[in-house]
Amino acid sequence: MFSLDSFRKDRAQHRQRQCKLPPPRLPPMCVNPAPGGTISRASRDLLKEFPQPKNLLNSVIGRALGISHAKDKLVYVHTNGPKKKKVTLHIKWPKSVEVEGYGSKKIDAERQAAAAACQLFKGWGLLGPRNELFDAAKYRVLADRFGSPADSWWRPEPTMPPTSWRQLNPESIRPGGPGGLSRSLGREEEEDEEEELEEGTIDVTDFLSMTQQDSHTPLRDSRGSSFEMTDDDSAIRALTQFPLPKNLLAKVIQIATSSSTAKNLMQFHTVGTKTKLSTLTLLWPCPMTFVAKGRRKAEAENKAAALACKKLKSLGLVDRNNEPLTHAMYNLASLRELGETQRRPCTIQVPEPILRKIETFLNHYPVESSWIAPELRLQSDDILPLGKDSGPLSDPITGKPYVPLLEAEEVRLSQSLLELWRRRGPVWQEAPQLPVDPHRDTILNAIEQHPVVVISGDTGCGKTTRIPQLLLERYVTEGRGARCNVIITQPRRISAVSVAQRVSHELGPSLRRNVGFQVRLESKPPARGGALLFCTVGILLRKLQSNPSLEGVSHVIVDEVHERDVNTDFLLILLKGLQRLNPALRLVLMSATGDNERFSRYFGGCPVIKVPGFMYPVKEHYLEDILAKLGKHQYLHRHRHHESEDECALDLDLVTDLVLHIDARGEPGGILCFLPGWQEIKGVQQRLQEALGMHESKYLILPVHSNIPMMDQKAIFQQPPVGVRKIVLATNIAETSTTINDIVHVVDSGLHKEERYDLKTKVSCLETVWVSRANVIQRRGRAGRCQSGFAYHLFPRSRLEKMVPFQVPEILRTPLENLVLQAKIHMPEKTAVEFLSKAVDSPNIKAVDEAVILLQEIGVLDQREYLTTLGQRLAHISTEPRLAKAIVLAAIFRCLHPLLVVVSCLTRDPFSSSLQNRAEVDKVKALLSHDSGSDHLAFVRAVAGWEEVLRWQDRSSRENYLEENLLYAPSLRFIHGLIKQFSENIYEAFLVGKPSDCTLASAQCNEYSEEEELVKGVLMAGLYPNLIQVRQGKVTRQGKFKPNSVTYRTKSGNILLHKSTINREATRLRSRWLTYFMAVKSNGSVFVRDSSQVHPLAVLLLTDGDVHIRDDGRRATISLSDSDLLRLEGDSRTVRLLKELRRALGRMVERSLRSELAALPPSVQEEHGQLLALLAELLRGPCGSFDVRKTADD
């Protein structure tokens, strides 16, 4: 006989057997909401400590229990309030406990609850001091303390139901037709965006491939049925199996139907007095009735519900652990239907008149059936020599053709230099004595006697400005000044220019013409003979292309070698090999801090000369001192709490408050503030301008960043007017080689941007990370160069000890494609691995191999690692290889100018974007893009508008245009300079007749510059394989099926579109295919920030590689052989003609690369013109079934 008491006893025993936990449940822990529904400070602090709490909880339980997901052990129950949402998180391991969270959105409330749970886990010892995970063995030991051995949870994953549930879900899925796409832009997407970023998603086709289903297994007895219980033994057994049946039923129905309640689909009707008879009507998955009796109403209902649970399990709708399946598994039929739609090839519809034109062209200009696109390797007998490599040597100092000086001319020039030197006496006396001066003879003798010398000089010793002058002085005073031609490299443009100007001033008017500089977009070379040329490392690398042995150069000084940027490490490889070609050349490596013995060993044990520096006293303040000074005592506890963590978040308000405090109470003098990047610079600048208000005229706020042209950065060296305080906001660009004389205060955020490359995802990540101790020393030194100063470090003293001594060399943490290409230009006979193994720190062989493979994929290298004809052209263009390829193809496809603008804007963003105005910038970009679906064409229109207003010569019009379109004038000037430089590069690569043709609308190279689809297609051809296919439907990691959402698929896997690209919020996509330049990794997700919709026929016709065709004589499919991202279908004639058109375009590219483009025979030019006109018309036509609309959820 069944009784409620025996039922409760059995249920308690069952739970103890399952969990070994006492029956009483702990009271829920609540994350209290602040008044008004906002998140309280305590809640924010929890989320700062646990920024990704749901991931962390899943990881702990997953590792402890050996399962791939923890959905069964973490159950989120949602409650909608009037102003906010409440979530109760039920935790089933290691003990049963509940926590609550609140938020304006569902995901916010879930994260609050999860963060509170993380705090519990940490208190229980399940997380380390830095919230790190333990290994599985340790979790087993910890679990025993709770009476919950992990072994009892070590169960295999539940088997997926062996059937399709088409009839179980009444909701129908409406895909957008063949090739079509639907997407919800409604509330669900907005609320779940953060969930997507935190937990990841899987597209429908991937999910289906992961589920090993037997689709032929029939549904077991899914017809409606009624169970009249004459004895309740079956019900008692069912209740033992399902101790909480009503909860389980509700959860199953809610998950399967995506509803917040199960009341409408699960209804009880109970009658009787002494014996209660309960009838449960279940309307899901089909109408079913279950009847049970009991002494009380609750008992009868529980029995009926248990019978229902038993039935659902027999249908495969409950897993082997008596838990609900995922939402996706309940909707497997819809998933399969949608998956079939996604896999179906898209139909090609080419108008008949265009097909006839293609046939006519191919009949007139047939492509030989045996013709196969070659690898385009450079051959001496079938290609015009390209570039200056095959011509006369270039003078590294002046850039003119190199001709050695005749002996008589050398004597005359040396005598002239000696006379000029003697006349400059008073100017030299005015120069201040520097710590390096007493070591003059030691340094000069070492340089004279040894081919390589390392000079280690502390900050302020004068090595950068004085050693080049000392070399020139010795040569001139010994009567051999004409033989002294020194190239001094600097890591940054601003330091090359400023140091050259400083040295020129110190040498005086008579020798000023002997000092010059050369940086990207700006050059002022010195006169030859007795010359000092300051340049960036990249400039010297290009000079080595045209003069591999540096004939005519007496010394190369590599300054700031300790920074270990990738170009400097590459230069050292070349200079080491250069010693055999030019033994007279003297190499000087100068370093402020660093492992100088390492450089000495690299160059065979060369001497290291240490020069002490001079620094005025600098008083240092650390975070705890700064917070006390600012009266921010409430921050002290928080910062102490996070002291042991590696969090690199910068509080811009704190930076602003500190600068204002220094201004109000500190000593007079300039303030130099080191910030990680451009966004932080703009953020602090805007905050300062808002705080200063009407008094802004008393301050000179100057940003310093590589995005800003040189002419706009020179103001930092100028003395401000009396009563005006200079505030310089800079990245680490101002750390070395640049001295701003009036700086008294340095604010050091302790952070900088560092590029890191993920070999697995092949994605770069620009991360904000802690600087090294060497960086801290350099930054502090900027305050004590010319007077006593103060350094304010926005990190605690304890953080300084945890910082690494030196930065990781850039060559070990960045993509290597450009470096491998440079290696092939300088030493083509060596393999990439062989060449880069000679670096001071050689990169990972796998990283080098990946770079080689990518260059082979884009057609720059052949299988033997030789430059192809395309690679030979790319060698002249100073930008990333894929962007350079796009430029080369644009010259061939006669749409050059817009591609030059796009590449320049991808190098320097023209928009004045900041953390505060990102949404406004995105709106402007969308307007500029019109209906092109392209961030890149938005760049083109922005620059075109700027060029137009410049012609008006009306200042107010220019300012209005900049303000309305949120454009940044210095960046636009830089972009203009880049376009000019690229034009010169293209001319050097024999792709145009003269540089001015590149920007001339009437030139042949711009004949199709107005054809937007062609421009986007050519950009895609250069960036390929950077191609995205938009797919409908996704499944979250938690198993929720979202049919009206989209995923973005690349060759490497799924990515996300960043909010900054216009295609993220587009209400209509004309094409399912997007191209992009760069993907970046942030918080574990891979994002694309710039994208363009591309015509599917452009993808088919313009990409490299082979295509695969299946033809039954009537219909045919064509796809890319190296990717599953494009499958097209059409009638056999259309597919055949498109394949031949593709081959004709490949032949055109090959011909154009094998000779000077402007010198092609007129007949070939005519053929190419007809072909391009045909291509433009084809891409101008309608997309047909490629048209894609994003629709809102019903």
UniProtKB/Swiss-Prot annotation:
GO molecular function, one term: ATP binding
Compartments it resides in: Cytoplasm; Mitochondrion; Mitochondrion matrix, Mitochondrion nucleoid
Highest taxon above the source species: Eukaryota
Bias kind Basic and acidic residues: ranges: 1-10
Enzyme class per UniProt: hydrolase
Keywords noted in UniProt: ATP-binding, Cytoplasm, Helicase, Hydrolase, Mitochondrion, Mitochondrion nucleoid, Nucleotide-binding, Phosphoprotein, Ribosome biogenesis, RNA-binding
Assigned EC number: 3.6.4.13
Amino acids binding ATP: G457, D458, T459, G460, C461, G462, K463, T464
Protein role: RNA-dependent helicase. Plays an important role in the assembly of the mitochondrial large ribosomal subunit. Required for optimal function of the zinc-finger antiviral protein ZC3HAV1. Associates with mitochondrial DNA. Involved in nervous system development and differentiation through its involvement in the up-regulation of a number of genes which are required for neurogenesis, including GSC, NCAM1, neurogenin, and NEUROD.
Listed name of the protein: ATP-dependent RNA helicase DHX30
Organism of this sequence: Pongo abelii
